[in-house]
Amino acid sequence: MGIDELYKKEFGIVAGVDEAGRGCLAGPVVAAAVVLEKEIEGINDSKQLSPAKRERLFDEIMGKAAVGIGIASPEEIDLHNIFNATKLAMNRALENLSVGPSFVLVDGKGIELRVPGTCLVKGDQKSKLIGAASIVAKVFRDRLMSEFHKMYPQFSFHKHKGYATKEHLNEIRKNGVLPIHRMSFEPVLELLTDDLLREFFEKGLISENRFEHIKNLLEAKKSVVFRKERTDHNLPLF
């Protein structure tokens, strides 16, 4: 008996929950919650599957399972941090399920959601439910990032999906930071200017809360640099 069946036997309806995009520099974090009645062949950790197989399994899961998807925006990531934004996306995924699970299996550790459950480290390799959720979250997010490429063709979001690849970092250096970048993340904050941040705000591309938060981070960063430079040269701080 697999791990999913053990929990189903004890709790009844069990959902697997996973996310995609937690470590990216751009775009949202996407979570999926999946309830499977019957096992689907080939489900595994989404990162170990080819893009073509992920797409095929995504369609099969969407057709045969109860699926909920939740998104936390770059703004929510900046304002609440990536851990809390990930929990927000996961809870939204659970809210969007058409059935109400009594227990959840969550990939990761230390994550408490609105439904009782347990966390499994590398859960997408141990649980078919979490594996299915990982596939749904990744394919949904990959498609979303491909749409961002159409909006911002100077960025290869259809390829690197917003991860901190060498190509993506070079694109930021060349073209500048976008509103969909996670401005609280290094190295995005390092490459963001005060003028560009204010331009985003004045054009209505970011909220006042986000503007003030990132402005404070930029000012704090300048203060740290100032202190380091003075200390390195044995100069008084004030």
From Swiss-Prot:
It is found in: Cytoplasm. Its main location: cytoplasm. InterPro entries: RNase_HII (IPR022898), RNase_HII/HIII (IPR001352), RNase_HII/HIII_dom (IPR024567), RNaseH-like_sf (IPR012337), RNaseH_sf (IPR036397). The keyword Cytoplasm applies. GO terms for biological process: DNA replication, removal of RNA primer; mismatch repair. Pfam families: RNase_HII. Its cofactor is Mn(2+); Mg(2+). It is an enzyme of class 3 (hydrolase). A divalent metal cation binds at D18, E19, D107. It catalyses: Endonucleolytic cleavage to 5'-phosphomonoester. One of its GO terms (cellular component) is ribonuclease H2 complex. GO terms for molecular function: manganese ion binding; RNA binding; RNA-DNA hybrid ribonuclease activity. Residues 12-197 form the RNase H type-2 domain. Its EC number is 3.1.26.4. Manganese or magnesium. Binds 1 divalent metal ion per monomer in the absence of substrate. May bind a second metal ion after substrate binding. Keywords: Cytoplasm, Endonuclease, Hydrolase, Manganese, Metal-binding, Nuclease. SUPFAM superfamilies: Ribonuclease H-like. It comes from the Bacteria. The keyword Nuclease applies. Belongs to the RNase HII family. Endonuclease that specifically degrades the RNA of RNA-DNA hybrids. PANTHER family: RIBONUCLEASE H2 SUBUNIT A, RIBONUCLEASE HII. This is Ribonuclease HII.
